[in-house]
């Protein structure tokens, strides 16, 4: 008899043992949570070996930032180690605890989690950097603004405000439905006004959505339900762009031209004007999405279908830049 088989997906970049480097299990604590992670150590590492703390994007993820069987952080850690760079990646707070409502936490909580890993790295290494993807990139910028990093790598990090990001994401989603521009504009204006009301402390149950076409009201209601969480309420108020001038350490910022979640043009513009007091390299990576995969449209739907986990030129850019510091 034939049994239903597990769908086998090809992920050719996922590292396979034996590795030409060492891995150690590491743990640290913050706010009552224990964080388990993997410290990847290149051959012949020493105190002068650069080390990178890796911070995941939004939503609860494991140390590999695993999504659709892609393991971007495992791929990056492998590439770094093969070029003589150490790294620490860790499972997000409450990983594997099914009773945790992850939306009760805020970006500031995740920033404190990341900061808590830095002392143990400083004990062992002289040069400690932070590499963050998406929300993790924003956290890297914020920690750098506090003087806590010797260098940072932002991969699709958000430099525009949280509110602007949410409005842009909504615009992208609604535009993809093929609706007329006036309707999209009207919807986005409504979202923008609603987010302002939420930022000013209004409960979502007190907000009216009169000016929205009937066919879009269910979508807006769903967005409103999410906006009631502490996570979104805090996210709206984030504006890393205002802190960029405080960053004194070297910055590498990469954004994909087909990113539909963190807009490439808007964010690189803010980075170019805001990073006024540090050595920085800002690159638009052509033809890649939010995960830095080569893609057709950049839509989230494609992430699973693409075999590539992360564009090789991105890995090369990161390792080369760190080694030239």
Protein language model regions, located:
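Conserved alpha/beta-hydrolase
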Residues: 75-97
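Short alpha-helix in the alpha/beta-hydrolase fold that links the catalytic acid
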Residues: 249, 263-273
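N-terminal cap/lid segment of alpha/beta-hydrolase-fold proteins
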Residues: 7-47
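Accessory cap/linker subdomain of secreted extracellular hydrolases
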Residues: 155-246
């Amino acid at each position: 008899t034939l049994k239903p088989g597990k769908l086998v997906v090809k992920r050719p970049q996922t590292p396979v043992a034996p590795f030409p480097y060492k891995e150690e299990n590491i743990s640290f604590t913050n706010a009552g949570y224990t964080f388990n992670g993997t410290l990847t150590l290149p051959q012949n590492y020493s105190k002068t070996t650069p080390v990178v703390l890796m911070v995941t994007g939004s939503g609860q993820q494991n140390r590999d930032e695993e999504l659709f069987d892609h393991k971007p952080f495992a791929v990056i850690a492998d590439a770094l180690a093969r070029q003589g760079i150490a790294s620490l990646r860790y499972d997000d707070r409450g990983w594997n605890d099914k009773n945790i409502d992850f939306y009760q936490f805020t970006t500031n909580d995740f920033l404190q989690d990341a900061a808590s890993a830095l002392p143990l790295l400083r004990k062992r290494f002289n040069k400690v950097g932070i590499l963050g993807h998406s929300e993790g990139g924003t956290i890297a910028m914020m920690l750098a603004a506090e003087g806590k990093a010797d260098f940072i790598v932002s991969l699709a990090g958000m430099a525009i405000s949280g509110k602007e990001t949410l409005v842009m994401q909504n615009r992208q989603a609604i535009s993809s439905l093929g609706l007329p521009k006036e309707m999209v504009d009207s919807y986005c204006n409504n979202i923008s006004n609603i987010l302002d009301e939420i930022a000013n402390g209004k409960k979502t149950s007190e907000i009216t959505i009169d000016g929205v076409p009937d066919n879009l009201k269910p979508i807006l209601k769903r967005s409103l339900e999410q906006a009631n969480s502490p996570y979104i309420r805090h996210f709206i108020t984030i504006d890393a762009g205002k802190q960029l001038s405080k960053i004194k350490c070297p910055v590498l910022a990469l954004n994909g031209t087909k990113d539909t979640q963190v807009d490439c043009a808007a964010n690189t513009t803010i980075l170019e004007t805001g990073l006024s007091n540090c050595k920085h390299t800002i690159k638009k990576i052509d033809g890649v999405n939010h995960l830095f995969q080569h893609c057709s449209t950049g839509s989230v739907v494609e992430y699973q279908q693409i075999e590539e986990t992360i564009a090789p030129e991105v890995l090369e850019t990161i390792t080369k830049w760190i080694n030239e510091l």
